[in-house]
Amino acid sequence: GNTVNGKIYAVPVAANVASSQNFAFNGPLLEKYGIDVSNVKDYASLEPVLKAIKEKDPNVVPFAMNKSYGGPSDDFDYVAVDGLPFVVDLKGDTTKIVDRYTIPRYVENLKTLHKYYEAGYIPKDVATSDTGYDLSQDTWLVREETVGPADYGNSLLSRVANRKIEIKPFTELFPHIQLAYTTPHRRQHRYTR
């Protein structure tokens, strides 16, 4: 099934072969309230930023997320789907599959997010909410986004939002599987780079 007259026809996917997790900040709100994000590098270092926006504008959600949030991002390669805890720890032994809940830095990030929830930086209805925090609105200050080199850093998110979005990576770039679509049956074949 994947050949026509003995030849394989495929359309490569022009996409990122690597990506990182980033905090995406609402640029107009950073400027309006004079909030500095230059020291943000992980979940723990977000606290002064979240506190500042909560004090300056209580109508803005400091850390936007809803019920689809799968937990803190980290340098993990998921061996199944994101909802399962089985990962390869890219900062640890990459020859083993482990439960992410046994990795101390992941547990610390969970504790940090819980602290933010209790402080009101994360929406109280996060577990049941379908609220989508539109990139183009001033309803949120920070959210998590996956960004790769083909996204040109801030520029793709800024173009989509039609406003400045400032990103701060908090994981390394890591390679991932891309798909090639072949004809005539549109089967998906996985390959890695």
Predicted regions: what they are:
Residues 1-193:
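Extracytoplasmic/secretory soluble proteins
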